Amino acid sequence: IPGAVLFDWKRDIIDSTKRDVISKQVLEDSLQRIGVNNDTTLIVYGDFKNWFATFAFWIFKYYGFKDVRLMNGSRKKWFEEDRPLSLDIPSYTRGNFKASDPDKSIRAFMNYVKEEIGSQDKILVDVRTNDEYNGKTLAPTEYSTEYGQMGGHIPGAVNVPWNTMVYEDGTLKSAVELKKLYESLNVTPDKEVITYCGIGERAAYTWFVLKYLLGYPNVKSYDGSWLEWGNTIGNPIEK
C-alpha cells in the first residue's frame, strides 16, 4: 500500500535468540526508525488474513501504544479490489516514540496457564485448526516451520479456530455473529479468557476480536502457545 512501512514480525517483534517478544528498548528503536511518535496512529495489515498484523497489534498494546488499528481485510483483499499499489520504499524522519512498561494484564505465561487449568472463572481458547487441536497435525499448512513435538491441546481448552471469525476475503464477521459463536461455547465476558495457538500470532487475532470487537474485559494471549507447551517435558496434554 503506498506509504506503508515494512515491519517484519521475525525481525522487529520477535527476539530470535530467545524466541520471545522483543524488549521495550528494541521496540522503541524499531518504531522510531520508521518515524513513529507517541501520537501517531498506526494501521496494521499483513498476509494470512492478518495473522501477523494482529500479533504486531498485540505487541504494540503490550508496550502501551495508544492508537493502533487493524485494517479490516488483509493485503490480499486490497490486491483483489485493484486498489493503489507501490514499489517505492518510503523514508520518514526518525520518530520519538517512548514505550511504556509491559502491560502484563494482556499476557499469560506457561506456569500461570498450568496453574489455572480447571479454574471455573477462567477459560482457555485454542484457536488452531481442529486437526491441530486433536493432535492429528502439529502445525498449520500455511506456516509449518515452528511447532510443538507433541500433538494435542491443553486440558480443558475449547477449540474455536481463528478462521471461524472471518469471511473468505479476510474481513471480520459481525459482532453479533461473533458474540453468538463464543457464548455458545461458554466463552463469556464474565470469565478471564486465555487464547493460544501454535506460535502466538493466531492467538493474538482472537485476543483482538474478544477484547476490541466484543469488549471482553479480561483477555490474555498465551504467546508461548503450543510451540512452548508441546515442547516442554511433563506438561499435561489432551487429545
What are these regions (language model features)?
Residues 4, 60, 78, 157, ...:
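Terminal peptide-recognition signature
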Residues 10-13, 48-51, 75-77, 129-133, ...:
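Solvent-exposed loop/turn segments at secondary-structure junctions
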Residues 14-17, 78-81, 169, 229-232:
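Short, charged, surface-exposed secondary-structure boundary motifs
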Residues 42, 122, 193-195:
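Generic beta-sheet signal
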Residues 45, 125-127, 196:
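Short hydrophobic segments within beta-strands
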